[in-house]
Amino acid sequence: MTDILFGNNNRPVLKLLTKRSLKAQKNTIAVLAIMLATLLFTSLFTIAISLQTAMQESNMRTTGTSAHAGIKRLSWEEYEKLSSDTGIKDIGYSIIIGNAVGDDFNKTPTELRYGDETYAELIFNTPDTGHLPEQKNEIATSRIVLDAMGLPDKVGTQMELTITTDTDTYTDTFMLCGIWDGDAVAYRQTMLLSKSYTEQVAPVIHGETDGTTPPVGTGYIDAVMMMPTAWNIEKQALDVTSKYGFGSMSIL
């Protein structure tokens, strides 16, 4: 553009300003595109993590444990070998006792076991009220079981219970010492009894097992394990259990 009075030609200046403006706009668009792409990938990553977490939680609720792996029907000596293996980060055990019988349990199948603290924690049986059984006739269980029995969720509550094992039936009175919520999705509920009572009615199995056990498995040990990492859990667990020839291992 030429100024008539002064003879100035502004066209080159205008072109330069226009180019700078377009370049600035392109840079702004590029920055916005990067921001949107970052937001998109972050959202997708968050959704993927959320879905994985939800699937893991659902699987844990169904199997009834947060453990990486478990192995069933061991003798005490077999468990000792397994628990001393350096390929296992943490391990807990339970001793199978039997099943609760009676009308209260027709719709709420309930098993009875002794479990150590690690086992109780990994199968979501750590009491939020009270404690795990210590005295001989103490018992801990879920609010789901107490509701099925028509009992209050109050520590100190007395209950009469009939238990069937592989070889006998026992009816005893227990005092409630620990309570947790329980999960209705679990395939069965659990009652935990003291070690001294368990030794009386379900002495632990010793020696070498051959893979054949009676229906209930009274006296046998179930173990739950945490591996060093959550990567390729099945291989880690198999590497450990194969050393001892255990064939009943289940990946959880």
Task: List each language-model region with its residue ranges.
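N-terminal Sec/SRP start-transfer signal
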Residues: 1-39
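Basic-flanked hydrophobic alpha-helices used for secretion and membrane insertion
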Residues: 48-252
